[in-house]
Amino acid sequence: MSGCNCGSSCNCGDSCKCNKRSSGLSYSEVETKETVILGVGPAKIQFEGAEMSFASKEGGCKCGDNCTCDPCNCK
């Protein structure tokens, strides 16, 4: 069971922990490249691919405002 109720009353189930860390959440981070160009002028630093995401065990049910699913796409 996904813990998410889809339909007209789309909301997350009991396992929803909006804005809180819980054991039901996993953290993933994408590798980041940093390019530093040095020379006569000031240093320029550029970051590429600085992305972070949180994934839950609720089968695609992401918590939005007021602990509702955003978007409601439960599997």
Curated annotation (Swiss-Prot):
- Per the record, a Pfam family? Metallothio_2
| UniProt keyword list | Metal-binding, Metal-thiolate cluster
Concerning InterPro entries, the annotation shows: Metalthion_15p
Could you tell me one molecular function GO term of this UniProt entry?
metal ion binding
Signal sequence region: none
Functional description taken from the UniProt entry: Metallothioneins have a high content of cysteine residues that bind various heavy metals.
The protein's matches in PANTHER family, at most eight in alphabetical order, are given as:
METALLOTHIONEIN-LIKE PROTEIN (PTHR33543:SF10), METALLOTHIONEIN-LIKE PROTEIN 2A (PTHR33543)
The record's similarity note reads: Belongs to the metallothionein superfamily. Type 15 family.
Q: What is this protein called?
A: Metallothionein-like protein 1B
The gene is MT1B
